[in-house]
Design a protein with these regions (language model features):
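General structural feature for long, well-ordered alpha-helical segments within catalytic domains
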Residues: 1, 14, 30, 72, ...
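Acidic/His- and Gly-rich active-site-bordering loop/insert found
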Residues: 1-64, 85-90
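General beta-strand structural signal in soluble alpha/beta enzymes
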Residues: 13-16, 63, 96-98, 124-126
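Short coil/turn connectors at secondary-structure junctions
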Residues: 28-33, 57-58, 89-94, 118-122, ...
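Alpha-helical metal-binding/catalytic segments enriched in His/Glu/Asp
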Residues: 34, 55-104, 143-148, 173-177
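Acidic, glycine-rich active-site loops and adjacent beta-strand->loop/helix elements
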Residues: 38-40, 94-105, 126-131
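Midchain, well-structured core segments that form catalytic/ion-binding scaffolds
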Residues: 103, 109-177
Length: 177
């Protein structure tokens, strides 16, 4: 994506492959951030086609990450490209910020934020739904520790619990031992 943007004449910044951005330079001070990510949760089972193939089905591009968040990122980039090709120059710089690990922990974005020269004055994310998502969930990973010793028993022990492939996806199967 960064190579394509540079080829189209946009300035780019790559934070050592932890994240980056594409700038459509404005004529005045200020940056509007358009924030997206290019990673996906694991594909899981049950696909009728290649989940990473970007299949066109009934006029829609379908596949893992097509709405969260590759589709919105690509649409944002092509909107910037179309404006540029029409001769439009924005007043504020439009910065398309590209994260690479939103689905896990955003540590790459922490790295990006430490290395970028200037943060946006405000921003939005064109994530997954039109016309807007008014709130986003977060990721909370935690351990629950509790002694399980019902009265009259010799005690039970939960030695492991496993399920799913990512902390922010719904597991199709879970197992407790």
């Amino acid at each position: 994506m960064m190579e394509l943007a540079a080829k189209e004449g946009f300035s780019t910044f790559n934070a050592d492959n932890y994240g980056g951005h594409i700038d459509f330079r404005g004529t005045e001070e200020g940056i509007v951030g358009v924030i997206g990510h290019l990673d996906v949760v694991p594909e899981g089972d049950g696909w009728d086609f290649d989940p990473y193939g970007g299949e066109l089905i009934d006029g829609d591009v379908c596949g893992r990450g097509s709405t969260d968040d590759k589709g919105p990122v690509i649409a944002s980039f092509y909107a910037m490209k179309a404006l540029k090709e029409c001769g439009y120059t924005p007043k504020k710089t439009i910065r398309l910020i590209l994260g690479l690990d939103e689905e896990t922990n955003w540590h790459g974005m922490d790295y990006y934020l430490k290395h970028v020269d200037r943060l946006p004055d405000f921003g939005f994310t064109p994530d997954a739904d039109f016309p807007a998502i008014n709130g986003e969930m977060g990721i909370l990973i935690f351990d629950i520790v509790r002694k399980f010793d019902p009265p009259g028993s010799k005690g039970l022990e939960l030695s492991s619990i496993k399920g799913g492939t990512a902390a922010n996806s719904v597991a199709d199967l879970a197992r407790a031992v």
